[in-house]
Amino acid sequence: MKKTNYITHAAIIGAMYFALTHLQNFLVPNSTSWLIQFRASEALCVLALFTPAALPGLTIGCLLYNLSFAGALPLDFLVGSFATFLACGSMGLMRRFPLPALAMPALFNGILVGWELTLYFGENGFTMAAFGLSALQVAIGELAVLYTLGWLLYRTMTKTGMARRIFG
């Protein structure tokens, strides 16, 4: 039963990430791939504070979205998904410290996706200045989502007991 719950939770979390990201991209075209992304589905990263199933769920949801979105950069399915994996893994390890844990997606996506964007869009090739700017822009979007929508989701799930009812 425990393994079934884990797989079910991971699948539902991945499907929610995939569907929310596509919905946002449908409603506001390309908003999920701007330099300063406000990818609302990233708020689901807070689920890593409640269940280890969020790690494969969010990683696979991100991977499937990046593979299915024609506007995604060629390496994004690997780089973006790996950043999500590292962020969620770190958040799970930091679950007793939720406020600093919320910064992990900004840290890993800022560095890895910032590097990727600099490779593709750096006008003079890869420079540290261009990388720093790209990393900062990606991190700003992540921080905005996690410390608004993510924190709201976290507080709602803890204060209402929803996290305990869903994840045990």
Question: Model regions: which residues?
Answer:
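Membrane-embedded alpha-helical hairpins and interfacial helices in multi-pass inner-membrane proteins
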Residues: 25-34, 63-168
